[in-house]
Amino acid sequence: MLTRRTLAAALIAAIAMPSLAAAQATTPSAATIERKLEAAPRVKLRPNERVTIREFKRRPDLRRMARSIDIQSINFAFGSAAIANSQYDKIETIADALRRILRRDRGARVLIEGHTDAVGSFQSNQALSEQRAVSLKRTLVREFGVPGHALETVGYGEEFLLVQTQNENWQNRRVTLRRFDDFIR
């Protein structure tokens, strides 16, 4: 028979689990980020099939074909796009990988995609995801010397959930780095 104490403990554990899981998300190593973003392209578009950056951002079919890596370890305060100094070691790892890629291939271009979970309105999640992507780009450029011309940003809000739930989910609150120079004119 369940007691109040047992039920309370179970409820507290259930509430704490997403936070514990988020805390356990680790930033991929710079080598892993490089390997993912420098892998052989999944598809090679002919020059006449290439698109504008704007069209690439709107076409999930093309985005799925691009080399990418999800970064779930950058933590933002609820409803905020500000990046705390405590997150800089994670961003430095990303910056190291991007700088090395750009040294080897000056034409490399990376899209920073911001994503949210489904909590909140569609409009607020859309705006927040855009702000977070811009915030990460700004930090990469200003604090870590990644060339800004190689980075584009976009926010998708709750449009592309990894975990299909309307509840809070740390896995859905992420940034995706997507290499897109193979797709644009």
Feature map (PLM): residue ranges:
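Residue-level preference for alpha-helix termini and adjacent loops
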Residues: 1, 14, 75, 82, ...
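N-terminal targeting leaders that direct proteins to extracytoplasmic destinations
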Residues: 2-67
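Short, solvent-exposed beta-strand/turn patches at coil↔beta or beta↔helix junctions
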Residues: 46-50, 54-58, 62-97, 117-123
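Short acidic/polar alpha-helix capping motifs at helix-coil junctions
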Residues: 62, 103, 126-127
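Envelope-exposed proteins and targeting segments
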Residues: 65-74, 79, 106-108, 149, ...
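Periplasmic peptidoglycan-binding/anchoring modules of Gram-negative envelope and division proteins
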Residues: 80-113, 141-142, 177, 182-185
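Periplasmic OmpA-like peptidoglycan-binding domain that tethers envelope proteins to the cell wall
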Residues: 115-185
